[in-house]
């Protein structure tokens, strides 16, 4: 099976996973035990790492500050960096920003573009590489933070 076909076949799963992560309100809030940036960012980080584990990647959560998911065994590592927290929603939303929806073929919700959606796309790309057994000379590490959007 070629890579492009596999990507097309993965579309529904990709959209489902983006919607799952976007549905978590991950605006920074009051810190709590084990959640340095509040409950939402911690939940979003764990959700992302759970998706990575389901894809067969090795994960590690660094006390809800950040985490990573690895694939491959090379001595060198290629890092892909992103985050799962979002800025406060502000005014002007005509629908709940944490209830993602598809309208006219476009996915809407807080974090779809910055940065939950792109990180899930990266995860699915790595998952497809793994499923296809494509050999890598370097390890791929998806590094995800829970506190990029704060002051």
Sequence positions of predicted segments:
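Acidic/histidine-rich catalytic neighborhood of metal-dependent amide-processing enzymes
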Residues: 115-116, 120-151
């Amino acid at each position: 099976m070629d890579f492009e076909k596999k990507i097309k076949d993965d579309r529904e799963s990709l959209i489902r996973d983006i919607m799952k992560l976007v549905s978590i309100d991950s605006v920074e809030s009051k810190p709590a035990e084990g959640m340095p940036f509040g409950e939402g960012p911690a939940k979003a980080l764990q959700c992302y790492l759970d998706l990575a584990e389901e894809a067969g990647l090795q994960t590690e959560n660094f006390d809800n500050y950040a985490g990573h998911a690895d694939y491959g065994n090379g001595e060198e590592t290629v890092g892909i960096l992103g985050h799962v927290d979002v800025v406060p929603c502000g005014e002007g939303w005509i629908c709940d920003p944490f209830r993602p929806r598809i309208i006219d073929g476009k996915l809407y919700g807080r974090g779809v573009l910055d940065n939950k959606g792109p990180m899930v796309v990266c995860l699915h790309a790595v998952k497809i590489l793994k499923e296809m057994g494509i050999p890598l000379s370097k390890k791929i590490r998806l590094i995800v933070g829970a506190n990029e959007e704060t002051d």
